[in-house]
Structure formats: C-alpha cells, structure tokens
Design a protein with these regions (language model features):
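Beta-strand-rich domains and repeat architectures in extracellular enzymes and scaffolds
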Residues: 23-57
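Short coil/turn segments that connect the beta-strands within blades of beta-propeller domains
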Residues: 43-44, 98-100, 157-159, 253-256
Length: 281
C-alpha cells in the first residue's frame, strides 16, 4: 500500500560530481568485474566486494586505501576469497578491535548460468589476508526463518543489524527485519536444515545438484525485532511509471536508505549511451 503521512519524496537531481567530491577512484581490484558493494572503515580504508570473472562462485573481499589521484592504484593483494556464498549484493563490515568481519549472505544456490543466489543464512567471516573461506567455514551463522536472498547491513554506532530478505509468500515486497546487533550475536544456538547446491562439497562451482545440510546457527527467530519494514518493489507509482533494479541499501538510526538504478543489462554500448538514472529513497 501507500506510505502513511505526507509525501516527502523529491525529484530534485544531484549536480554532476567534480574532483572535489571524490573520496577514492581508480582502485585496482583483483578481477576485471563490477564491484558489488563497498564499506568504509574507521581507519580510512575502503572494503570492496566483487564477483570473480573466472569463477562465479567466488567473492573477493578487498581492503584498499583511498586513492584521490587520477593514477590507477597499483595491484592490490590485500584481499581474501569467499566461495559458494552467494551474489554479495549487499554486505556489512563489523569492526572488533583490530579485527574485521564481513557479514554476507551464505549457502547460496547455483542456477543454470552458474550464478549463486537465494542465500539461506547470513554468515560472519573474520578477515584473513590471502585466505579462502568456503560457505560452510564461517565463524558464525544467523538464521531468520524460512527465507532466501539474505543481505545484511550493520549500524554499529546504534547497535543495529538489518537483514533484507525475500519472502515467497509476499514476493511483491522488499522485506527487512531489524535486530539489536548485540542481541543477535548472543542469540541462542540451534541446528537448521537448509537446501542449497553441493559445489562447496564437490569443488564443482557450476554444480546445480541440490543437497540438504545441517548448520549450527544463532536463531534470530527467538528475538523480538526492533522493526520489520517492507515496501512494494513495483506498482506503487503512477500509471506507466518506470521501476529500476535494486542496487543496495543501508541503515542508520531510524532511517533505511534504499538505492535503485539503471543497469546496462550487459548490452553492448548501452553503458555509454548518455545519462542514466539512480534514486535513493
């Protein structure tokens, strides 16, 4: 349905960025593929996630220093590999003293194109430079119920863990559940049986063979969420309105920031065809 209260939307465009706006650019990543997302560290570094261009089952988690110059940053070898997790569309960085942890959707399902989607759990992985971690080797797992396509976000300052998920019974909605981060990390443990594909067991990244596995998880269904917002993916605008692909989200205090934008849909030349559109709600 329509949101309650006055319409506070804006169609005001943002002016073209110039050099003074740039925090970092021309950063060398391990693979020649699009970035899936990034997180900023309090020490000033930037953490990037990207899919490998040679193995769609692999996510690269990369640490880099900001680069404000027009020169391409030299080859970056400060990264680790996460395999058989999922698409990595939205991930979260947790700082714990000198340690860093990535929260990401885990136990994804390989489709006929070799792509990994439909993540069943959220995994928490400690950063170890040069390491390769499979989806069944996380430090911790978090279960929110029988949902798929899990994508986390963390607002540590305000003790919030948000998880975006797909609900097969409400597929027209983009769904979120928000917990106290401190409560989630202490939630009771349970054994959960999930169905995924067996690539992580057989080392065959393109395998679509289903397998059931039992995973020891923090059971977030035992907690009372801070909030459980949802909104329609499409159909809420005027007749003939255009809707764009989801590109990511973040949460800070009592606000959820949701990004949509155009894709080039892998069509030759379309990326260079002129202006494109992106919206933050």
């Amino acid at each position: 349905g329509k949101p309650e209260g006055p319409d506070k939307s804006s169609t005001t465009g943002i002016d073209r960025f110039d050099a003074s706006n740039i925090f970092s650019r021309n950063t060398y990543l391990p693979d020649n593929t699009a970035m899936q997302g990034f997180n900023l560290d309090s020490d000033g570094s930037v953490w990037y996630t990207q899919l490998s261009n040679t193995n769609q089952a692999q996510l690269n988690w990369v640490r880099a220093q900001p680069n404000k110059t027009p020169d391409v940053q030299t080859e970056n070898k400060d990264y680790m590999k996460l395999t058989y997790f999922g698409h990595g569309t939205n991930t979260a960085l947790e700082e714990d003293g000198a340690d860093r942890y990535l929260w990401a959707g885990a136990y994804g399902v390989c489709n006929a194109k070799g792509q990994y989607w439909n993540e069943k759990l959220v995994g928490r992985v400690k950063y170890v430079k040069g390491a390769t971690v499979k989806t069944n080797e996380c430090n911790d797992y978090y279960y929110i119920g029988d949902y798929t396509d899990l994508h986390p976000s963390i607002d540590a300052e305000n003790d919030l863990l948000t998880i975006n998920y797909g609900d097969s019974k409400n597929s027209s909605y983009r769904c979120f559940v928000i917990y106290k981060l401190s409560e989630a990390k202490k939630a009771p443990m349970t054994n959960v049986t999930i169905t995924c594909t067996d690539g992580f067991q057989t080392d065959r990244p393109a395998s679509t063979n289903p397998v059931s596995v039992v995973v020891r998880c923090h059971d977030l269904t035992t907690l009372t969420p801070v909030a459980r917002p949802r909104f329609l993916k499409t159909g809420y605008g005027a007749s003939g309105a255009t809707y764009y692909d989801w590109q990511g989200y973040d949460v800070h205090k009592n606000r959820l920031y949701y990004t949509e934008g155009q894709s080039n849909y892998n069509l030759f030349g379309s990326f260079y065809s002129g202006s494109s559109f992106a919206y933050v709600t």
